[in-house]
Each structure stands twice: as C-alpha cells, then as structure tokens.
C-alpha cells in the first residue's frame, strides 16, 4: 500500500510544477533581455521570473 502511494506522488509531482517563463521563452525561439528588445524583435513575455523581457523576431 505504501509503495503504491509513493508511486502516485512521484507521478503527480512533475506535472504540478509549471514551466519557468525563461524555458517558455527559449522554446518560442526568444532571447531574454534586461533592457529594450533589439531592432526587429518584439517583447512577448518575460524571463527570469519577470525580471527581463522575452524578445522574439517579428516573423
């Protein structure tokens, strides 16, 4: 019984942890910038828990 409960908890833990905003930015082919986004890039979210901007290309 105890092993079964441990197995259920181990399956639930990775699904409960949300993906960080930095990982989400990198998956969308963005780069993190603490200043303004460079030319030909637009801000589309945050990085480093809201401390930086996620800059992605226009196209």
UniProtKB/Swiss-Prot annotation:
Residues 1-18 form the signal peptide. InterPro entries: Defensin_beta-like. GO terms for cellular component: extracellular space. It holds the Pfam family Defensin_beta. It comes from the Eukaryota. Keywords: Antibiotic, Antimicrobial, Defensin, Disulfide bond, Secreted, Signal. Its main location: secreted. Gene3D superfamilies: Antimicrobial Peptide, Beta-defensin 2, Chain A. Belongs to the beta-defensin family. This is Gallinacin-14. It comes from Gallus gallus.
